[in-house]
Amino acid sequence: MYNSIEVVHSKREGDSMKLKRSERLIDMTQRLLDNPHTLISLTTFTTLYQSAKSSISEDIAIIKKTFEKQGVGIIRTVPGAAGGVIFVPKIKREQALAAAEKLKEQMNDASRLLPGGYIYLSDLLAKPNVLHDLGKMIASAYEDKKIDAVMTVATKGVPIAQTVANYLNVPFVIVRRDSKITEGSTVSINYVSGSSSRVEKMELSKRTLPSGSNVLIVDDFLKAGGTINGMRSLIQEFDSTTAGAVVFCESGVSNHNVSDYSSIIKITEIDTESQKIKAVLGNFFVTHEFL
């Protein structure tokens, strides 16, 4: 289900004024980019720009063609009196692969090796351009799955989940391993950590996730899969469903106790003695379609 805009809710200098077509195209483009997955009625545009529907339709056709050509996204048209246009962020396959290849090369760095078979990712996940690419890739793959919320576990997965949620224009929820008094009442579950085989706890505020939600799980790293299994169990406790699970990086040298997930980068070899690490592209590019 899409959000909708009947009346433009952000005032800018020049609102409801007659603009030149070039100015109108720029302003319209920005409004679409600012409101992904949101139905904007043609009446909103005709009122805002004091232009005929035929002129607005021509403008939208120009933007639609350019967005698709440049790999920005697609514009869907909803017919009828209550119809309008919806901007859906998408990425071209070649753009996604090029971004992932750059990340893969940065992952092939032995200095990223941490004790216990973990990989240092914090520097990458602090870069806005990396988050932009990851967020758009994942959101593009799930744009037609009617996602209601993006879920991650504190703390390293938060930047990716927030970026994905921004592109999908849905809330993101943070699962914690220890409760905060500011969260109010919570729902908690026990799960088996795949990496340590210990029973651990995760919890989520009752007010965070409405019953019946379709949830996309996003995380930074997968070693054995216990965390993803735990989040799936927690989603069930909210009478909701898991639409999918995506991780930025997975360790292919560990035994996984989880299925039905995709990864953007996969570590296929770790040798702490010789300080060697090998990364390849994950199955994300096999299991998902792009623009």
Listing of model-derived features with the role each one plays in the protein:
Residues S57-E68:
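Residue-level detection of the helix-turn-helix DNA-binding "recognition helix"
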Residues Y2-S41:
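Extreme N-terminal segment that seeds HTH/winged-HTH DNA-binding domains in transcriptional regulators
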